Amino acid sequence: MRQKLVIGNWKMHGSLAANAALLEGIQAGAGVARATLAVCAPFPYLAQCQALLNGSKVAWGAQDVSAEARGAFTGEVAASMLGEFGCTYVLVGHSERRTYHGETDQAVAAKALRALEFGIVPVVCVGETLAQREAGETEAVVGRQLQAVLEALTVEQLGRVVLAYEPVWAIGTGKTATSEQAQAVHAFLRGQVAARDAGVAGRMAILYGGSVKPDNAAELFSMTDIDGGLIGGASLKSEDFLAIGNA
């Protein structure tokens, strides 16, 4: 049975004082959480996460990583640097990166590969827009996004990846895919991975990332192929994040 995983994506939120209070609250309840908990913080706060969470039951990670190992890439952050700050996870291909920064499927795959090279688990995000869903293109879109990763990674590397399905139309909009809609896409994604390796597919955590809240988490997480959540707004309140972790 796959262990539930709940990752908080703070996006571009936080301050040293607010983070300290948030992490203290999360740690206080992490010991009894049913899911494994992690937070993905903005780069400047990774040292704070390392200092406050080291030795706790809460893991931490980053929200992006460079596909390059090192060099003259101003503004980029290397996977080796994330490793020095104890990052377990890194998000790659989040819809906001794809939309606002023009990240291609191939760039996302390259970032995932680089993270794995330095022992960091890439959380590969895929998802469709409202227009794509209404046009019946959901499987074609997420399948294409996933295929780039499947082609770039070996089976062994794929076994160290976490997937996250984030319907773009349900992020920050208050809209949520029904549990059945989400399950259908998760099952499709697992099937695509299974076509490469059934064992990896059976073990892979596939998270749901579309406006998960304390009042809908339990129903979503009860679905066969939903193994937890990638949490946005609700991860900024310790009580909400813990409630989701206990769903």
Curated annotation (Swiss-Prot):
The top EC class, named as a word, is isomerase
Residues that hold substrate according to the record: N9, W10, K11, G172, S211, G232, G233
- Where is this gene product found? Cytoplasm
Q: Which domain of life is it from?
A: Bacteria
The active site of this protein is located at: H94 (electrophile), E166 (proton acceptor)
In terms of Gene3D superfamilies, this protein maps to: Aldolase class I
Task: Give me the reactions it catalyses.
Answer: D-glyceraldehyde 3-phosphate = dihydroxyacetone phosphate
Q: Which UniProt keywords apply?
A: Cytoplasm, Gluconeogenesis, Glycolysis, Isomerase
Q: Which GO terms describe its cellular component?
A: cytosol
Q: Which InterPro entries match?
A: Aldolase_TIM, TIM_sf, TrioseP_Isoase_bac/euk, Triosephosphate_isomerase, Triosephosphate_isomerase_AS
> Record's Pfam families?
TIM
Q: Which CDD domains match?
A: TIM
Per the UniProt entry, the Enzyme Commission number(s) are 5.3.1.1
The record's principal subcellular location, in a coarse class, is cytoplasm
| Known pathway | Carbohydrate biosynthesis; gluconeogenesis; Carbohydrate degradation; glycolysis; D-glyceraldehyde 3-phosphate from glycerone phosphate: step 1/1
Key word Cytoplasm present? yes
One GO term under biological process is: glycerol catabolic process
- Record-level Gene Ontology MF annotations: triose-phosphate isomerase activity
The similarity comment for this entry is: Belongs to the triosephosphate isomerase family.
PANTHER family assigned to the protein according to its UniProt record, in alphabetical order: TRIOSEPHOSPHATE ISOMERASE (PTHR21139:SF42)
Q: What does this protein do?
A: Involved in the gluconeogenesis. Catalyzes stereospecifically the conversion of dihydroxyacetone phosphate (DHAP) to D-glyceraldehyde-3-phosphate (G3P).
Q: What is this protein called?
A: Triosephosphate isomerase
Q: Which organism is it from?
A: Cupriavidus taiwanensis (strain DSM 17343 / BCRC 17206 / CCUG 44338 / CIP 107171 / LMG 19424 / R1)
Per the record, the gene is tpiA
